[in-house]
């Protein structure tokens, strides 16, 4: 099926599935098949922020005073987060947009990916402030063995989906020879690759950031690197939205409401999805071990972080219909919720950047009934 950027075939977008229907033609928002994506778009737009709004000048002084093992923890996490958001800033667009059939989902994916580019810019803003030569930090990302291990697990599902999608659009279903290699293009197999890719992205948004988040917030609990923590808090707020988006996509697909065949595929893939999540959790535990190889920090150590990874992995897997792999049922670092739930902290606006401020949140829909109780 050849892809077109504007299909001239008239269709009812309310009858299209989320994926593998007719490509979106008119980007219209007066109607939605799934209004959850419209709500996510509006929420993400109201969250808009720029890293330059946050003052990180004090962080340079704090960073210079950190012991070497804490510098390792801080800078390693920034490298890892830069990798994750470098992938997420481009991959959802490249992998998902050519397959999407409804405008609200198309715009949500574009909005989601754009916000990830702001996260990447934020890490540059932080790193440029604390080190004299940012290139030393960025150049290490593609050579650091610990980071590369994680990159392979994240990018493989995206790459397989993108490759198979290009064959499907160019050649259609069937058995083809491409550069001397036999390629079998099958729509059901492509749907399976999409489902696994979405589950992989869900695992990324669900657990892969949170070891780094916990460390950033632990520094701020000691009144260190507070500018960084404010930025990370804004990033965490965005990531919670992105997680909600992938969870809704997966749950709509596995329920069969959107595409009955996807419900069968979800059942077939259940074990692979389970293994995918457990592997991601294991990699995060290994990352915690790498971070604390030279010593722990006040309020946080490897064991506590590993318990936290197990705790959030259980919650995230349950949200997409998977069995729970770990015994940990309580949050070992409850103070982190103060940072992750943006409404929990009240501050005086003149004293600090207000991370809970929203823009564009006025409801402009006014009905005559709203004025019925007014008397002149």
From Swiss-Prot:
Note, other: A substrate-binding catalytic site, located on R1, is formed only in the presence of the second subunit R2.
InterPro entries given in the database record: Ferritin-like_SF, RNR-like, RNR_small, RNR_small_AS, RNR_small_fam
Gene3D superfamilies in the record: Ribonucleotide Reductase, subunit A (1.10.620.20)
Residue sites binding Fe cation 2 per the record: 116, 205, 239, 242
NCBIfam families referenced in this protein's UniProt entry, alphabetically: PRK09101.1
PROSITE patterns on file: RIBORED_SMALL
Complex formation: Tetramer of two alpha (R1) and two beta (R2) subunits. The B1 protein is a dimer of alpha subunits. A radical transfer pathway occurs between Tyr-123 of R2 and R1.
Record gene name: nrdB
Record note on cofactor: Binds 2 iron ions per subunit.
Annotated signal sequence range: none
Protein name as catalogued: Ribonucleoside-diphosphate reductase 1 subunit beta
Catalytic residue positions: 123
Similarity annotation: Belongs to the ribonucleoside diphosphate reductase small chain family.
An example Gene Ontology biological process: deoxyribonucleotide biosynthetic process
Residues given in the record as Fe cation 1 binding sites: 85, 116, 119
PANTHER family given in the database record: RIBONUCLEOSIDE-DIPHOSPHATE REDUCTASE SMALL CHAIN, RIBONUCLEOSIDE-DIPHOSPHATE REDUCTASE SUBUNIT M2
GO MF entry, a single one: ribonucleoside-diphosphate reductase activity, thioredoxin disulfide as acceptor
Keywords linked to the UniProt accession: Deoxyribonucleotide synthesis, Iron, Metal-binding, Oxidoreductase
Superkingdom, natural source: Bacteria
Organism per entry: Salmonella typhimurium (strain LT2 / SGSC1412 / ATCC 700720)
EC identifiers of the protein: 1.17.4.1
Function: Provides the precursors necessary for DNA synthesis. Catalyzes the biosynthesis of deoxyribonucleotides from the corresponding ribonucleotides. R2 contains the tyrosyl radical required for catalysis.
Catalytic function, reaction form: a 2'-deoxyribonucleoside 5'-diphosphate + [thioredoxin]-disulfide + H2O = a ribonucleoside 5'-diphosphate + [thioredoxin]-dithiol
Cofactor(s) needed: Fe cation
